[in-house]
């Protein structure tokens, strides 16, 4: 059965390692018969969450007028979410973290999907990715 796969490439570098792996994931998912869309988060305008809770009182609408409403709707509509980030100081890059934070008002519509993670880093010690993976897992299991 075909699934809607949304890949969020958090890397600020187009053609960087994370972005290349996103393209390979997309290719494999398409070859398996799935509908795939990849969004390069760095190419979108996404303000960080202000924690003003406007969204809580306005049906999930955000005070920021940017590309996040479109991204969030695609996240809600997807069956599978792929989150990709380079490891920056043992965590997710700022671009993808802003997207994650901005899902707060409609999180119940995002959770309970299949999640996959693509993590890249320059460090040869695999444990350096542990905190980043914990952030991703915490988000998915919230």
Report the location of each language-model feature.
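Short, glycine-/small-residue-rich phosphate/pyrophosphate-handling segment
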Residues: 107-142
